[in-house]
């Protein structure tokens, strides 16, 4: 491998602003903002809008939408039109 071509991998604090949760995770993300973590150390800080704490798939609040097929949708909308014309 070539030396000095990979970004630095370091701990970064991610803040899910939708549920006010913080995560300390290793990342190569570059940011100028910092925050003091629970252990007393200062880490780079990055805000996110969706994480495993707020995404409906992971929280179990997912809604399942049943989509009809194109033929079923057509039949539902226009199926009665041809029956009275005979």
Curated annotation (Swiss-Prot):
PROSITE patterns named among the record's database cross-references: RIBOSOMAL_L31
UniProt GO cellular component terms: ribonucleoprotein complex; ribosome
GO-annotated molecular function: structural constituent of ribosome
Keywords on record: Ribonucleoprotein, Ribosomal protein
Gene3D superfamilies: Ribosomal protein L31
One annotated GO biological process: translation
Record has Coiled coil as a keyword: no
Pfam families given in the database record: Ribosomal_L31
SUPFAM superfamilies: L28p-like (SSF143800)
Subunit structure: Part of the 50S ribosomal subunit.
HAMAP family tied to this protein: Ribosomal_bL31_2
Family, per entry: Belongs to the bacterial ribosomal protein bL31 family. Type B subfamily.
PANTHER family assigned to the protein according to its UniProt record, in alphabetical order: 50S RIBOSOMAL PROTEIN L31, CHLOROPLASTIC, LARGE RIBOSOMAL SUBUNIT PROTEIN BL31C
Protein's UniProt name: Large ribosomal subunit protein bL31B
